Amino acid sequence: MKGVDDAFLGVGDKPGLDIWCIMGSNLIAIEKSLHGKFYTGNTYIILSTVELKSGVRQHNVHYWVGEEAKEEDCLTASDKAIELDVALGSNTVQYRETQGEESDKFLSYFKPCIIPIQGSLSSHMRIYGDKSKDTTMFRCEGEHVARVTEVPFSRSSLDHKAVFVVDTESKIFLFSGCNSSMQTRAKALDVVKHLKENRHCGRCEIATIEDGKLVGDSDAGDFWNLFGGYAPIPRDVQDTVMTELMTTSSKKLFWINKRNLVPVETNLLEREMLNSDRNYILDCGTEVFLWMGMTTLVSERRTSVTALEDYVRCEGRQSNARSVILTEGHETVEFKMHFQHWPKNAVPKLYEAGREKVAAIFKHQGYDVTEIPEDKPRHFISCNGSLKVWLVDNGSVTLLCTEEQEQLYNGDCYIIRYSYIEDGKDYHLFFAWSGLNSINEDRVAAASLMSGMIDSVKGHAVVAQVFEGREPEMFFLVFKSLIIFKGGRSMAYKNFVSQRSDANGWYQKNGVALFRVQGLKHDCIRAIQVDLAASSLNSSHCYILQAGGSFFTWLGSLSSPSDHNLLDRMMDKLCPLKQSLLVREGSEPDRFWEALGGRSEYLREKQVKDWPADPHLYTCHFEQGLFKAKEVFSFSQDDLVTEEILILDCVEELHIWVGHQSGVLSKEQALDIGKMFLQAGIHQDGRRPIDTTMYIVTEGDEPRFFTSFFNWDYSKQTMLGNSFERKLAILKGISQKLETPERSLRKSSSSSLPRRSPGTSSSEPTTPEQRAAARTFASASTGKLLRERSPAALSPSLSTPSPSPRSRSSASSSPASWNSTPSTVARRLFPPSLHASAEAVATGTPRRR
């Protein structure tokens, strides 16, 4: 390829890393066994290739600059990164990484850590590792990736906010500053393990020192003797430069005209401001983006990269502002979030396109292929469990009989409990299902009553909040057969309808109704009543039309034979004694259209299935009263630390994992944090619907459908203590007594255990930031928790009920009283009366309606 280095030809075809070192104008490929070993006097280019579930390859290019690297090597690296982008079709994202200020994404490639080696690499030498026996000292920061910096071996290098590792000939000391988080201390133990295995061949002692702890600790005495005796450490000084960059809200946009920056005057950033024939610089404080239009020349892009580096250098921010270079059409979420209403990308449906190509090949070779078998979903839940369904009505629940639990109404809310045995353990999966037309009062009651039911079961409980139209496949799996009718049976919904005098569309046994039939072959089947109109039809689906005493089964022209089989099975469920008239699309009789109110246009195009989304893990916290979420790259089970709450984002559903020491006091609060995450629009092109399915998974209660996202080690699931104590026990080979701690969030919140030091095992908050987290999560609220599309929002009489003891007790929990940011006063998110009544009615007797 013209203008591209030969070293880049054919790269990026396989997932993994490719690394080159800049040697003058040449590129020296680094073999796999030496990945992660960087010299301070060199510059490197790193290509990360990831194959997404869609089959698309994602490329990230990083060029790493050592603190002693030559200026000409840095310029060569930026030019070579542009060449690599061209070789890969101009669809990469490029990051400039400076030694000591690397991004979390970059550091995640080289877990547990990278420790740059002094000097430079020549093309005639090999790296055998640092064999020096001299005492070295490292500063460790970071909670999910270790940010390691070698510092002078001196007492003056110590401070209270970081963790330090001192590596001597016979012993490795870990010193934890009193203001360091438990997660940082635990992550620093990974560095200790790395040094022990690579510098000491696994043979050395490990000592942990706590800042300020001296009495009766021989290891502390040995540690301070290295520095000539103990002396107080000065107080930490705040980094005002970084704080100013992080708190600034102003953004600067420039377009590049022959290395000159021309400001774009605007108050709000819009996508339309970026022209495809220009390159732009967007300065966002801690990050500086270079956006390159798709029609710009390679020479213009190289000039723009130089302009970017000049800009950062002139601003004096080489060390604290990260440069990100991207091409039009391949923008990162972090970049798009700075703009108002960024349009969603129209990406090709490679998942379905590949299946169609396979079918075409078989047909060309003479095979009679009527249908390529669809991918069977992975079931990480037993389908042989027991099901119970409760109707939420007037602040209480009523257990439905077996015949009725497979018939839901879209004006009601239900609590579903599915109990099953997995690996010899009892699991209970709770769903709070809200119908499309259900009212806010029932929705709030369902979430609260479900939390009360959890305490009445033994075993491992997982909670899910589900809304009609957004249900996960697992919801339908537990039913196996389900019919959703229009209408409702709760008193609140009936009152709402009577006030509006609108009961049209309610299902009547001998009336007229249209049902869309879908399913997963023999695993589960569902029929959903839709609007009685021809516009509700879809060529990709099958339908049942009930017209009084007559039934039609309508086959869409794009539906499959398996869909037709599901249709026959649903007819047996819906009307077992009736014979239906089979109607194929395009040959409908007149009375079919008459029952639908006449002909009209409907969707006739093939509905292709999106590929499974790649999961992303985020850690959540509050910063100055504002909700923050940060992605954890290359995540593993070890990233689920007990002091945190993490969200596994699978796009169509969220798994909210709650650690025992996270400070989250109830499952309602965990749902509240999930809604904050959705409203923030993290990882997506704008905000997602608030009715996205959310699972609440408590530490120790992880079901298989959650652990399947990780390479799960069940022995870690039952360990006690904080994250530092657990990792230290593994490192020292100490076998813990494995017990099952209290799983209920609400029960653990009432614990009155005395406060303990970090060296003892307890779920009580032990550090200042843990206690602050507990206070923060206790007072956090979402703002608008309930869906805006609920019909109750349209009815003033329901949003402001008449005074009564019950309504007065729940007034403080109304949506109008919730703020968008945490307040200093803790408040209950749901009415306490609902919590109190839940256990009393959870085991009620079935009632037939």
Curated annotation (Swiss-Prot):
Gelsolin-like repeat spans: 30-107, 147-213, 262-335, 405-475, 527-566
Q: Where in the cell is it found?
A: Cytoplasm, Cytoskeleton
Pfam families for the chain: Gelsolin (PF00626)
Record flagged with keyword Cytoplasm: yes
Q: Does the keyword Glycoprotein apply?
A: no
Name the GO terms of the biological process aspect: actin filament capping; actin filament organization
Which GO CC annotations does the UniProt entry carry? actin filament bundle; cytoplasm
Q: Which Gene3D superfamilies match?
A: Severin
Residue ranges of the region described as Disordered: 739-849
Q: Which InterPro entries match?
A: ADF-H/Gelsolin-like_dom_sf, Gelsolin-like_dom, Villin/Gelsolin
| Bias (Low complexity) ranges | 747-782, 791-823
Q: Which GO terms describe its molecular function?
A: actin filament binding
Annotated SMART domains = GEL
Entry keyword set: Actin capping, Actin-binding, Calcium, Cytoplasm, Cytoskeleton, Repeat
What the protein does comes down to: Ca(2+)-independent actin-binding protein. Binds actin microfilaments (MFs). Involved in actin filament bundling, severing and capping. Caps the barbed end of actin filaments and protects them from disassembly. Promotes VLN3-mediated MF severing.
Q: Which family does it belong to?
A: Belongs to the villin/gelsolin family.
What is the designated name of this protein? Villin-1
Source organism (scientific name): Oryza sativa subsp. japonica (Rice)
Gene that produces this protein: VLN1
